[in-house]
């Protein structure tokens, strides 16, 4: 197994242009596919999850042209649904942002489609989405365990009507349903059961749908109306914002060891909820400066916080490791959906924080972290989870440094993360 040793870092300073957002990249690729016209996507993320989506679209007959560095894509829309005369089997790795939306989109047309992935994907639930699609007439068959991939779709289109979908596990299910609803045969009324988690991710979806010409009536996130007869139309160009979750590591670095760290590609005009991570750093005592498309973090002594972070679940992981450098006990609440991500992130985070000496209480949907007097060095297991590797890079700011196991797992969203991280040092 590959290991990366991060030696102690005294101070960080510099500027990082954040690569494109994973959430926006895969949503935009699918909407561009369903749209009339050709769409040019710029600042597209070049990572494993996006490659799985692109490979699947190509297999489904979508024509696109990628730039040499894979960050610009010119895609010819189908002007409607995806159909195939021959049976198709698509491998989607561990890419939830490809599996869930494609599962929904492939029910719209005609054909037989089988969706598979890595072993971890077979443990990531999709039942709430499939239950909703079945209410609209979809024929979806699980191939192993009910409620989980792999699965086969025998597509004949979706009817309109009323549909209920659970919102308390993952917002990706609602995102997938929203994106396909305009192409159903009739108007769709979506009723959300339970408290909707990660609402800012739904805002990303609605903003992109509007960019492609579709209107959704949002009744306070409890009900969504999508009138029949709408069509996605290419806006011509789509600029993919920098990934706000990826920005969190560099902003935390500035807060812990700044110096001054500036991230560009996200700012106060961002449609991503994870930019609110900077507000949490500010509550902890960091000096934060906002621009339209940049955020600056400057360091100071951090103090612990006790907050509901359901609205920023991915970026909240960075608070868990930043908490090691804060005075007091930090509590991150309402984060049950950490458990159904690339790994069970609550269990993984608790295990690895204890390795470096932290006192950790792991609840069903919260984590409580008290930093040790002296942070220990350790070998950090990353569980094939990109965010575990990037979060624990913060331990380079301890006096003893840290070793990251399987550092290349960052290829899921940020292949050159550690190179960029090193550029801030000195």
From Swiss-Prot:
<dbReference type="InterPro" id="IPR023193">
    <property type="entry name" value="EPSP_synthase_CS"/>
</dbReference>
<feature type="binding site">
    <location>
        <position position="22"/>
    </location>
    <ligand>
        <name>3-phosphoshikimate</name>
    </ligand>
</feature>
<keyword id="KW-0808">Transferase</keyword>
<dbReference type="GO" id="GO:0009423">
    <property type="term" value="P:chorismate biosynthetic process"/>
</dbReference>
<feature type="binding site">
    <location>
        <position position="96"/>
    </location>
    <ligand>
        <name>phosphoenolpyruvate</name>
    </ligand>
</feature>
<comment type="pathway">
    <text>Metabolic intermediate biosynthesis; chorismate biosynthesis; chorismate from D-erythrose 4-phosphate and phosphoenolpyruvate: step 6/7.</text>
</comment>
<dbReference type="GO" id="GO:0009073">
    <property type="term" value="P:aromatic amino acid family biosynthetic process"/>
</dbReference>
<keyword id="KW-0963">Cytoplasm</keyword>
<feature type="binding site">
    <location>
        <position position="337"/>
    </location>
    <ligand>
        <name>3-phosphoshikimate</name>
    </ligand>
</feature>
<dbReference type="GO" id="GO:0008652">
    <property type="term" value="P:amino acid biosynthetic process"/>
</dbReference>
<feature type="binding site">
    <location>
        <position position="387"/>
    </location>
    <ligand>
        <name>phosphoenolpyruvate</name>
    </ligand>
</feature>
<feature type="binding site">
    <location>
        <position position="314"/>
    </location>
    <ligand>
        <name>3-phosphoshikimate</name>
    </ligand>
</feature>
<dbReference type="InterPro" id="IPR013792">
    <property type="entry name" value="RNA3'P_cycl/enolpyr_Trfase_a/b"/>
</dbReference>
<feature type="binding site">
    <location>
        <position position="412"/>
    </location>
    <ligand>
        <name>phosphoenolpyruvate</name>
    </ligand>
</feature>
<dbReference type="InterPro" id="IPR001986">
    <property type="entry name" value="Enolpyruvate_Tfrase_dom"/>
</dbReference>
<comment type="subunit">
    <text>Monomer.</text>
</comment>
<dbReference type="InterPro" id="IPR006264">
    <property type="entry name" value="EPSP_synthase"/>
</dbReference>
<feature type="binding site">
    <location>
        <position position="124"/>
    </location>
    <ligand>
        <name>phosphoenolpyruvate</name>
    </ligand>
</feature>
<dbReference type="InterPro" id="IPR036968">
    <property type="entry name" value="Enolpyruvate_Tfrase_sf"/>
</dbReference>
<comment type="function">
    <text>Catalyzes the transfer of the enolpyruvyl moiety of phosphoenolpyruvate (PEP) to the 5-hydroxyl of shikimate-3-phosphate (S3P) to produce enolpyruvyl shikimate-3-phosphate and inorganic phosphate.</text>
</comment>
<feature type="binding site">
    <location>
        <position position="198"/>
    </location>
    <ligand>
        <name>3-phosphoshikimate</name>
    </ligand>
</feature>
<comment type="similarity">
    <text>Belongs to the EPSP synthase family.</text>
</comment>
<dbReference type="GO" id="GO:0003866">
    <property type="term" value="F:3-phosphoshikimate 1-carboxyvinyltransferase activity"/>
</dbReference>
<keyword id="KW-0028">Amino-acid biosynthesis</keyword>
<keyword id="KW-0057">Aromatic amino acid biosynthesis</keyword>
<feature type="binding site">
    <location>
        <position position="27"/>
    </location>
    <ligand>
        <name>3-phosphoshikimate</name>
    </ligand>
</feature>
<feature type="binding site">
    <location>
        <position position="341"/>
    </location>
    <ligand>
        <name>3-phosphoshikimate</name>
    </ligand>
</feature>
<feature type="binding site">
    <location>
        <position position="170"/>
    </location>
    <ligand>
        <name>3-phosphoshikimate</name>
    </ligand>
</feature>
<dbReference type="GO" id="GO:0005737">
    <property type="term" value="C:cytoplasm"/>
</dbReference>
<feature type="binding site">
    <location>
        <position position="172"/>
    </location>
    <ligand>
        <name>phosphoenolpyruvate</name>
    </ligand>
</feature>
<feature type="active site" description="Proton acceptor">
    <location>
        <position position="314"/>
    </location>
</feature>
<feature type="binding site">
    <location>
        <position position="171"/>
    </location>
    <ligand>
        <name>3-phosphoshikimate</name>
    </ligand>
</feature>
<feature type="binding site">
    <location>
        <position position="22"/>
    </location>
    <ligand>
        <name>phosphoenolpyruvate</name>
    </ligand>
</feature>
<dbReference type="Pfam" id="PF00275">
    <property type="entry name" value="EPSP_synthase"/>
</dbReference>
<feature type="binding site">
    <location>
        <position position="23"/>
    </location>
    <ligand>
        <name>3-phosphoshikimate</name>
    </ligand>
</feature>
<feature type="binding site">
    <location>
        <position position="172"/>
    </location>
    <ligand>
        <name>3-phosphoshikimate</name>
    </ligand>
</feature>
<protein>
    <recommendedName>
        <fullName>3-phosphoshikimate 1-carboxyvinyltransferase</fullName>
        <ecNumber>2.5.1.19</ecNumber>
    </recommendedName>
</protein>
<feature type="binding site">
    <location>
        <position position="345"/>
    </location>
    <ligand>
        <name>phosphoenolpyruvate</name>
    </ligand>
</feature>
């Amino acid at each position: 197994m590959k290991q990366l040793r991060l030696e102690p870092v005294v101070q960080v300073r510099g500027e990082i242009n954040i690569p494109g957002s994973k959430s926006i990249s895969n949503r935009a690729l699918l909407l561009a596919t369903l749209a009339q016209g050709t769409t040019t996507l710029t600042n597209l993320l070049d990572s494993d999850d996006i490659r799985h989506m692109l490979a699947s679209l190509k297999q489904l007959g979508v024509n696109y042209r990628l730039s040499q560095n894979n960050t610009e894509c010119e895609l010819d829309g189908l002007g409607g649904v995806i159909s195939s005369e021959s049976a198709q089997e698509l491998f989607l790795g561990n890419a939830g942002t490809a599996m869930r939306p494609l599962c929904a989109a492939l029910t719209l047309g005609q054909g037989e489609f089988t969706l598979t992935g890595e072993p971890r994907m077979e443990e990531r639930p999709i039942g709430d989405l499939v239950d909703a699609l079945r209410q609209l007439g979809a024929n979806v068959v699980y191939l192993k365990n009910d409620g989980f991939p792999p699965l086969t779709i025998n597509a004949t289109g979706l009817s309109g009507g009323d549909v209920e979908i659970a919102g308390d596990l993952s917002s990706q299910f609602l995102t997938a349903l929203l994106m396909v609803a305009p192409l159903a045969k009739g108007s769709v009324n979506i009723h959300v059961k339970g408290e909707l988690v990660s609402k800012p991710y739904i805002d990303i979806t609605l903003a992109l749908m509007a960019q492609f010409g579709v209107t959704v009536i949002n009744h306070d996130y409890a009900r969504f109306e999508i009138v029949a007869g709408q069509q996605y139309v290419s806006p011509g160009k789509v600029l993919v914002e920098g990934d706000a979750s990826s920005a969190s590591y560099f902003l935390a670095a500035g807060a812990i060891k700044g110096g001054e760290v500036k991230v560009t590609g996200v700012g106060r005009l961002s449609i991503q909820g994870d930019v609110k991570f900077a507000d949490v750093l500010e509550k902890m005592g960091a000096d934060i400066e906002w621009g339209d498309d940049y955020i600056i973090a400057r360091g100071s002594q951090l103090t612990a916080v006790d907050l509901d972070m359901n609205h920023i679940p991915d970026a909240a992981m960075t608070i868990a490791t930043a908490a090691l450098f804060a005075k007091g006990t930090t509590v991150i609440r309402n984060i049950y959906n950490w458990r159904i991500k690339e790994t069970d992130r609550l269990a993984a985070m608790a295990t690895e924080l204890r390795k470096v000496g932290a006192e950790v209480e792991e609840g069903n949907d919260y984590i409580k972290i008290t930093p040790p007097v002296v942070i220990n060095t350790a070998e950090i297991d990353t569980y094939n989870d990109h965010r575990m590797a990037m979060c624990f890079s913060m331990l380079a700011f301890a006096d003893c440094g840290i070793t990251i196991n399987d550092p290349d797992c960052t290829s899921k969203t940020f292949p050159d993360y550690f190179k960029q991280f090193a550029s801030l040092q000195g």
